[in-house]
Amino acid sequence: YVIGFFAAIQAGNIAVPLFAPELPGHTERLDAVLSDATPSVILTTDSAAESVNAFLRKLPRGRRPRVIAIDAVPDSVGATFVPAELDSEDLAYLQYTSGSTRTPAGVEITHRAACTNVLQMILAGGLDTNIRSVSWLPLYHDMGLIMILFPPLCGGHITLMSPLAFVRRPRRWVKQLATESAFGRVFAAAPNFAFELAAQRGRPPAGETWDLSNVAGLLNGSEPVTISAIEKFTEAFAPYGFPATAIKPSYGMAEATLSVATIATDARPSVIYLDRDQLAEDRAVPVSPDAPMAVPHVSCGQVISSQWLTIVDPRTGNELPEGEIGEIWLHGDNIGRGYWGRTKETQDTFGNTLKSRLTQRSHATGTAAEARWLRTGDLGVYLNDNLYVTGRIKDLIIIDGRNHYPQDIEATASQASPAV
């Protein structure tokens, strides 16, 4: 998979990271992506070629791309290979969005955007060329894909395992983090659920000793971050030297290549509690944790180097001050070029300009007046220069003019009965 991805890019093609046809529940998504991307060739392995061909035979003949098993290609073919001349603004790959609420869209990631975001993450994490990584994330997912970009761009070493290996035995991931800690500082990333799962089922067996003291950073993102998952993981592995500052709640998205904001290298994860009634009015008002309407929100820290993140009124395009909830807008060289084959959606999402900026403490300072901004569709707020992500615009449930966040409704339901 890794070889095929980099080979496609070196040959001057646009790579499209995808998954095997037998992945449960993803057949329609795979068909939609193939229809949208219209690839000329599919790279796979000899062992998976039959299932790939079986899937393609279900498609109309005109939509069936050529299939190449890369491990069946003789090494001698490389003797005549001439690398393509690439420009930093050329497309490197298409990162397809999750498609949970719409048809998957291919985000056009240029070489500049990919390299910029990896370097931004290196600087934000205080990492170096000796960094060690351990990843079980799917390579077709933006978080998993960017992990394999670290070694060729910045040096270091990465150990890969399958998602199934982690889900079956979360201990494998944590143990490998400890193993890599013996050789240097360790950096990894995972969605929030993984920390809770590893805390439950990832501890070492009796009599086995691990050393996790060299784990420099574990990004927690790709889904809403909860303080309970962070605390459970930290508490479970503190006896093995796991630093209290290691878990890094983060914010990112495929349209920005991946990473946008995270907490400082020496910071511990932090949580505030906001009044639910005020949230319904688009205001972030901190309250005590035991207040009856308190809703926890974990800080995603600050926007990382050479990016801009501002909170905007989605109806007017005006920048909002601290404490007011609005849409998160992004600007930077790491932002994708647009959506593959979707001109109008690209303009609506990637081609926005701020109608007005704050005269003081503007988070758009340093960008040109005509700068193009990415509308994320996410809702967020700045409090004490920390970013808090409160939800998605499309997910809001509006009743009698008041906003209701689905995650709050889910939390209330889960607290009402242990059976939920």
Language-model regions, residue ranges each:
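Gly/Ser/Thr-rich phosphate-binding loop
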Residues: F183-A189, A199-A294, W308-L309, R315-E319, ...
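Conserved pre-ATP/AMP-binding loop-to-beta segment of ANL
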Residues: V67-Y96, R102-T103, N117, L123-R132
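Structural core segment of the AMP-binding/adenylate-forming
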Residues: Q10-G78, P191-N192, L197
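ATP-dependent adenylate-forming carboxylate-activation enzymes
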Residues: N13-V33, D46-A48, G156-T179, Y405-I409
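Short hydrophobic alpha-helices that are characteristic scaffold elements of the AMP-binding
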Residues: F5-P17, D36, H141, P152-C154, ...
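Conserved AMP-binding/adenylate-forming
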Residues: Y1-P24, S135-P138, N403
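Conserved ATP-binding/catalytic segment of the ANL
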Residues: H297-T310, P314-G323, E327-N403
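Conserved AMP-binding/adenylation subdomain of ANL enzymes
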Residues: C115-R132, D142-V186, R201-P205
